[in-house]
Each structure stands twice: as structure tokens, then as C-alpha cells.
Amino acid sequence: MEDVWLQAQSNLAKVLTHQTFTTWIEPIRFAGAHKNTLLLEAPNQFIRDRVRESYLPMILESVRSLTDSHFQVELQVAARQQEKTAKSPRKSHTEDELGPVESEKCAPAEFSTNLNAKYTFDTFVCGGSNQFAHAAALSVANNPAGKYNPLFIYGGVGLGKTHLLTAIGNQVLTKNRKARVCFYTSEKFMNELINCLRYQKMEQFRNKFRKMDLLLIDDIQFIAGKERTQEEFFHTFNALYESHKQIVVTSDKFPKDIPGLEERLRSRFEWGLIADIQPPDTETKVAILSKKADSDGIRLPDDVALFLASSASTNVRELEGMLIRLGAVASLTGKNITLDMAREVLKDIIVDKTKEVTVEMIQKYVADHFNIKVAELKSDKRLKALVVPRQIAIYLCRDLTKASYPDIGEKFGGKDHSTIIHSVKKVDKLLSQDFELKSTIETLRKGLLN
């Protein structure tokens, strides 16, 4: 059966690019066969997961062309790699926070700070998009329960809210090792509350949280609509505030925009300082990538950093994930990171913006997508079947071209620039609420860029 795999590899080499084949298929080894299943091994989990995700159907087709249509392929990590992983098990952040409530006990009064030591002010890249939030967080860290209590930081996913929140805790502990600091997601706070209610240990729960010097709660929006959790957090907030203890929370929205959040909590969040984090510009993204690459020992060429920053989303976490993937491929294959490698390795999650998109291209593409005429898209007709595509097209023009608001208005039938601004803001606001709209715009964006 090993001959079958070698032949299948040879066939795949003819249809895949050299870069793809040598990176993902060549490292796969024959491990045996059982009945009608071919057993294959990847040298590590990273390659196994990537091959399973992107190339397993192609592998299966190649193997079946040499055997029969009922043949199966099973891909595992090499045994020696599994043993290495087993010796150093790591529980993921998600498991820690979102594990089954039934399996947990109510946490004792003693606590862990839950702080990630890597998230400090030194490792945070400051730019125009996050400068205000950074300054506010640093001020709170240097003077807890001073001017800004509570501190409410809000912004989109992956922009650095958790980093700043954790940096505050780490800075406070650097100055005072005896400070009672605790970082919790609102989900974990709720899970612990549920368990303490179940085991009738509410006094222990209250003693734990109401005796903190600094309470850091991430993603507070998740307690919205949870009456008992909001009730308990409200009293915890009051107890800490009245004791002149610092409270810092993060959210993906401004307090007034969180649906299901009680008015009494909303008003308390507005007592202190509210700071927002905006998506980073290209220069800031390049700086973030460079700092992360230096920290992780990854040699990242300037042209690749610029390619990632120009082509990727504004989600910093996603940006760093791409860098980690590139670093892993370079390390596992013994090759240097190049622009060609970046395009190949990240082609499933990145779009290349080197092709210039024009307003006219967007109008034609959106009109075709919604099966309407370009003239209707540019008209003043207020039919819903035309208004929504028109607003989407205007939003994409602002997002993908360098055209100014007046320029866009001129190309949409001479509309006033204030109308164009309204359309952009309207779509921008709806994107956080309407997942169908978000999916449509993402599909159109990728189609235009590809």
C-alpha cells in the first residue's frame, strides 16, 4: 500500500504548484493500512490540520483513482509528535472559559489573577487608532481608582481591548505585588456565579469579587439579557466603587448600544471614562507585525509585512494569526518567508489588493449581483430593492477606492456628499447587527478584489 501513496503523491505533484506540494503534501508519510483505509502521518499537528482542511478531498480522490471508490484515508500526527504533545498538555483559553458548567465547582475564595504575562504596555503597539484608549489605560494602571473609574473600553473584535485590559493588571501588580487583581471574561464570571448558586456558596462568591483592588472584566456585553448575572455584577460594581477600588470593563459596543443591558448598569459605565479603539491604519498594522515578528523570532521581510497589512482585515488577532502561520511554515519547511510564500500559504484567508478597483467596477459588479441595472443603482428611486444595493455599492466604493465622498456622489447621479456619508454610516452601523448583510458585503468585496 505504500506504493499507492507514493503514486498518489506523484499524481498530486502534477496538479499542485511546487510551493503547495512541497509545503503540504510532500511531508505526509505512509503509516500503514487497515482493511480499506490508508493510514497517513503528518510530521506535526499544524500540517495535519491544514491538510485536512484544504487538501484531504484531493488526496482521497487521488488514492481512490488507484484503488476503489470505497477506499478511505485517515491522517494523523506522527506518534513521536503525539507523545511530545502529551508530555506537555495545554488547556486552551476557550476550554478554560467555556467548559461545561456541570464539570466545574464553585471557585474558592483564593484566586488566580488569570493575567497573560505577555500582554503589557511594552508589547502594545500604539497608533492613532488606539492612542486615546492606551493613554486612558496607562493612566488607570498608574493611578487606580483615580480620575477614571470605571474605565470602559470598547471596539471591534481583535483590536487590542483584551491586551490593554490585561496590561493594566500586569502594571498594577508590578507596582504592588500584594494587590488583589483579577481578570475575568463575563462568561466565566457568569459560570462561576451559576456554580456558586448551585452549591449554595454565594457568600464565598461575593467575598471573592467584592474584595478586589482591581477588577477587570472582558466582553461585558455577554451578560446582557442575563438578569441574575447583571444583578450580581451590579452589586459587585457598587461594592467596589464605594470602596474606591478600580473597575475596568471592555465591550464590542458603546454602553447605550448594548441590547439587553440594564439601564442601571449602563449609567454606571458612563460614570467614568469611555474610550474607543478604532481599526488600525496600514502603518500601525505594519508596526504590529514587525513587533510580533521580532518577539517570536520570525524573519519578516518588509514587502511581506506591507502585503499583509494592505491585504488583511483590520482584526489584529487575525493579522497575528497569519504571521504565526507563515512563521510555522517557514520553520517546518526550512524556507525563508517570501511574498510568493505568503500569497500561497494565506490564499484562503487573504485577498490581494494590488488590483485597483474603481467606482465603475463596483457599480457594475453590485448591479449584476442584485440583478438590477447600473442606471437604477445610480438613480434616486427609493424602492427597497434599489436602496439596499445602492448603499452597499456606496459603502464598497468608500472601502475599496480612493474616491472622496463628493467624487462618489458625482458618480452616483450627482448625489450630495452628505447623502454618501449617510449611506456609509448606515451600512457601517448595520454590519454589527445584520450577519446576512455582512456576508453579502464580504462576498462582494472578495469578488471585486479577486
From Swiss-Prot:
Q: Which domain of life is it from?
A: Bacteria
* Signal peptide limits: none
GO-annotated cellular components: cytoplasm; plasma membrane
Region Domain IV, binds dsDNA, as annotated, extends over 331-450
SMART domains, per this entry?
AAA, Bac_DnaA_C
- Specify where the region named Domain I, interacts with DnaA modulators lies, as residue ranges: 1-71
Keyword Cytoplasm assigned? yes
**Annotated region (Domain III, AAA+ region), positions in chain:** 114-330
Instruction: Read off the Pfam families from this record.
Output: Bac_DnaA, Bac_DnaA_C, DnaA_N
- Biological processes annotated in GO: DNA replication initiation; regulation of DNA replication
User: What residues does ATP bind to?
Assistant: 158, 160-162
Q: Which InterPro entries has this protein been placed in?
A: AAA+_ATPase (IPR003593), Chromosome_initiator_DnaA (IPR001957), Chromosome_initiator_DnaA-like (IPR020591), Chromosome_initiator_DnaA_CS (IPR018312), DnaA_C (IPR013159), DnaA_dom (IPR013317), DnaA_N_dom (IPR024633), DnaA_N_sf (IPR038454)
Q: What does this protein do?
A: Plays an essential role in the initiation and regulation of chromosomal replication. ATP-DnaA binds to the origin of replication (oriC) to initiate formation of the DNA replication initiation complex once per cell cycle. Binds the DnaA box (a 9 base pair repeat at the origin) and separates the double-stranded (ds)DNA. Forms a right-handed helical filament on oriC DNA; dsDNA binds to the exterior of the filament while single-stranded (ss)DNA is stabiized in the filament's interior.
Task: Describe the subunit structure.
Answer: Oligomerizes as a right-handed, spiral filament on DNA at oriC.
* Family listed: Belongs to the DnaA family.
Q: What is known of its domains?
A: Domain I is involved in oligomerization and binding regulators, domain II is flexibile and of varying length in different bacteria, domain III forms the AAA+ region, while domain IV binds dsDNA.
- Protein name per the record: Chromosomal replication initiator protein DnaA
- Which organism was this protein described from? Geobacter metallireducens (strain ATCC 53774 / DSM 7210 / GS-15)
Gene from which the chain derives: dnaA
